[in-house]
Swiss-Prot record:
Biased composition (Polar residues): 48-58
Expression triggers: Down-regulated by HIV-1 Tat or phorbol ester (TPA) treatment in endothelial cells (at mRNA and protein levels).
Tissue expression per record: Expressed in brain, liver, lung, kidney and heart (at protein level). Ubiquitously expressed. More abundant in heart, pancreas, liver, intestine and adipose tissues.
Name listed for the protein in its UniProt record: Endothelial differentiation-related factor 1
Length: 148
């Protein structure tokens, strides 16, 4: 190596571990044995990413001492959805496809298990043509002139 200068030096290196190998339990334990800093963190609720998250304040719900539950869709609204859907000749799956939701969402709303979401209720209202919110539940939606 007496004749080596920066231009002619050959460096032989082992390739580093791939991302999957670096995350393995074996690699983590080996790094800990060598005394290296190892940072591990879990993704929170990664497999349960939902389109419509519940926006109710859960901390407020925890502090409350009386009724410990979120308001659910009333059975009256569920029946109106069901009747409106059937009058249009739609199945739960057809209605869900029409409003870009999962069939389970429609089933939950019809059975009264769902926590009301104004976006979803608005889409269902437009699809079946019946009001689901306010005091005139079950009445047809009047299509008036739109303001520009």
């Amino acid at each position: 190596m007496a004749e080596s200068d920066w231009d002619t030096v050959t460096v032989l290196r082992k390739k580093g571990p791939t991302a999957a190998q670096a995350k393995s339990k074996q690699a983590i334990l080996a790094a800990q044995r060598r005394g290296e800093d190892v940072e591990t963190s879990k993704k929170w609720a990664a497999g349960q990413n939902k389109q419509h998250s519940i926006t109710k304040n859960t901390a407020k719900l925890d502090r409350e001492t009386e009724e410990l539950h979120h308001d659910r869709v009333t059975l009256e609204v569920g029946k109106v959805i069901q009747q409106g859907r059937q009058s249009k000749g739609l199945t739960q799956k057809d209605l869900a496809t029409k409003i870009n939701e999962k069939p389970q969402v429609i089933a939950d709303y019809e059975s009264g298990r769902a926590i009301p979401n104004n976006q979803v209720l608005g889409k269902i209202e437009r699809a079946i043509g019946l009001k689901l919110r306010g005091k005139d539940i079950g009445k047809p939606i009047e299509k008036g002139p739109r303001a520009k």
